[in-house]
């Protein structure tokens, strides 16, 4: 089959990343689509799952198994557990992820138990939280930095971890790529192959519009865990004491509305969901709109260089570094200019997608 005649379906991901990826594939000459186009999935020669493994159940739903299964590529954006996950912590993690009636009893009986058996949901939550607390305690003993990771985030991470192992052991994933080295190292440590390719810039993330920057500091995201809310509350008070306003927007903000908002923003605050990994989304959307990213300290920022592409500090020092960059326009603009050139030039999505397909032996370009 001619490489350019490949039909590639892109499964849903966060922040329209699936639309960006599909558009990049079309620009590279491939026939690509997302669920929005309502095309028959059986037409696909390749399926790319962006973000995590949760969506892989559609292979079973559409009976895309055996000889009918297309090539499956996983491009992991969301975090997996840290590399130093101990054997005991791994047992707690997998036990917590399996506290699910459908997993324990099968889909049909599990749904019945979950829906109709009194206190089934409450019992599941109690058992699961016990395992998650044990996991958190074990990992905090290994690294005190993990102590701030909320139980909610541990829950998401361990579900992702269990699904990944299940699908890999079933042979349902042909190629694995990660957007950070931390995830790649964890997967290799499990005995599977993975390669690091960062997610790249697409115009949907944003563009420079030349607006007056009248928003000092912006945090864009959900305050759906206790730690994040605690950090925001403290920062709000510290910045207000210095005459700086922190704007927090929790609702979804997409496309042009988000781009306009970021073009009015001087500093975009990045708070980590987990201490050992980070997502690329805030970096790409902020840098492409000329806003300075000020982040909690990232263990492995990789391609993004602190002091060159963004600023970082310990959580307790965030207010201080924010005030420093607000007072020094030239220093802030030096970093935002460098960051803009980096993401819109070197980190183009089409370039990274082409590299990904080449490593899957699906493209020679």
Outline where the language-model segments fall.
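Generic C-terminal helix-cap and adjacent flexible tail
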Residues: 361-365
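Nucleotide-sugar donor-binding catalytic core of glycosyltransferases
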Residues: 2-44, 49-307
């Amino acid at each position: 089959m001619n490489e350019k005649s490949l039909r590639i379906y892109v499964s849903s991901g966060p922040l329209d990343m699936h639309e960006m990826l599909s558009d990049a594939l079309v620009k590279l000459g491939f026939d690509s689509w997302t669920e929005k186009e309502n095309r028959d999935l059986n037409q696909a020669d390749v399926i790319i799952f962006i973000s995590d493994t949760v969506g892989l159940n559609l292979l079973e739903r559409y009976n895309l198994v055996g000889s009918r299964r297309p090539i499956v590529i996983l491009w992991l954006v969301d975090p997996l557990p840290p590399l130093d996950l101990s054997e005991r912590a791994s047992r707690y993690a997998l036990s917590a992820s399996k506290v699910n009636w459908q997993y324990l009893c099968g889909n049909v009986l599990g749904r019945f138990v979950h829906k109709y058996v009194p206190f089934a949901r409450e019992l599941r939550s109690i058992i699961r939280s016990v395992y998650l607390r044990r996991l958190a305690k074990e990992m905090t003993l290994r690294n005190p930095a993990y102590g701030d990771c909320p139980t909610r985030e541990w829950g998401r991470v361990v579900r992702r971890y269990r699904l990944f192992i299940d699908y890999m052991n079933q042979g349902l994933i042909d190629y694995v790529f990660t957007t950070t080295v931390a995830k790649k190292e964890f997967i290799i440590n499990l005995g599977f192959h993975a390669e690091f390719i960062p997610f790249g810039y697409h115009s949907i993330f944003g563009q420079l519009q030349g607006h007056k920057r009248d928003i000092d500091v912006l945090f864009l995201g959900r305050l759906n865990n206790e730690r994040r809310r605690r950090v925001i509350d403290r920062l709000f008070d510290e910045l207000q004491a210095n005459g700086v306003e922190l704007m927090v927007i929790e609702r979804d903000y997409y496309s042009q509305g988000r781009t306009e908002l970021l073009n009015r923003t001087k500093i975009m605050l990045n708070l980590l969901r987990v201490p050992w990994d980070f997502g690329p989304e805030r970096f790409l959307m902020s840098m492409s709109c000329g806003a300075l990213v000020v982040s909690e300290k990232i263990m492995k920022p990789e391609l993004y260089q602190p002091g060159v592409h963004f600023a970082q500090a310990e959580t307790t020092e965030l207010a201080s570094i924010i005030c420093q960059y607000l007072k020094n326009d030239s220093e802030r603009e030096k970093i935002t200019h460098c960051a803009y050139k980096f993401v819109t030039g070197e980190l183009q999505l089409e370039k990274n997608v082409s590299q990904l397909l080449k490593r899957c032996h699906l493209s020679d370009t």
